[in-house]
Amino acid sequence: MGSPCALGLFCCCSSCFCLCCPRHRPASRLAAVVGGAAAVPAVVSGVTGLILSPSPSPIFIQPTPSPPMSFHNPGLELALDSRPAPLXPLGVTSPSAPPLPPVVDLPQLGLRR
């Protein structure tokens, strides 16, 4: 029927697009399997996760749910922090920032037009 697939599926090149099949690998990034090896060719919309299929019944891919935020990762705290960053008033520099050099006027450098 089909050659064994590395994903544990069977690839029938006449009826499905398989990631493991060298003929179909550039054409499709998704192993569309509906009812075993009898799958329909599908076009995947990466934005919505919806498969546009020529079959009369629509096929939907549900995005994988994100893991619960109960784990503590210090690297993700900054990205997931919902509090706005404190803003300093204009004209006040941070103590850790070096002072800006004074503005140099062009005539002081001897450059003339």
Curated annotation (Swiss-Prot):
Motif (PTAP/PSAP motif): 95-98
Modified residues (Phosphoserine): S70
Compartment annotation: Host endoplasmic reticulum membrane; Host cytoplasm, Host cytoskeleton; Virion; Host cell membrane
Annotated region (Interaction with host HPX), positions in chain: 27-67
Region (Interaction with the capsid protein): 47-71
Region feature Hydrophobic, mapped onto this chain: 1-21, 32-52
Region (Interaction with host SRC, HCK, FYN, PIK3R3 and GRB2): 94-103
Region ranges (Homodimerization, and interaction with host AMBP/bikunin): 71-113
A Pfam family: HEV_ORF1
Signal peptide: none
Domain notes: The PSAP motif is necessary for the release of membrane-wrapped virions from infected cells.
Quaternary structure note: Forms homooligomers. Interacts with host SRC, HCK, FYN, PIK3R3 and GRB2 (via SH3 domain); binding does not activate the kinases. Interacts with host AMBP/bikunin and AMBP/alpha-1-microglobulin peptides. Interacts with host HPX/hemopexin. Interacts (when phosphorylated) with capsid protein ORF2. Interacts with host TSG101; this interaction plays a role in viral release from the host cell. Interacts with host SIRPA; this interaction down-regulates the phosphorylation of host IRF3.
Family: Belongs to the hepevirus ORF3 protein family.
Summary of the function given for this chain in its UniProt record: Small multifunctional phosphoprotein involved in virion morphogenesis, egress and counteracting host innate immunity. Plays critical roles in the final steps of viral release by interacting with host TSG101, a member of the vacuolar protein-sorting pathway and using other cellular host proteins involved in vesicle formation pathway. Also acts as a viroporin and forms ion conductive pores allowing viral particle release. Impairs the generation of type I interferon by down-regulating host TLR3 and TLR7 as well as their downstream signaling pathways.
Designated name of the protein: Protein ORF3
Organism field: Hepatitis E virus genotype 3 (isolate Human/United States/US2)
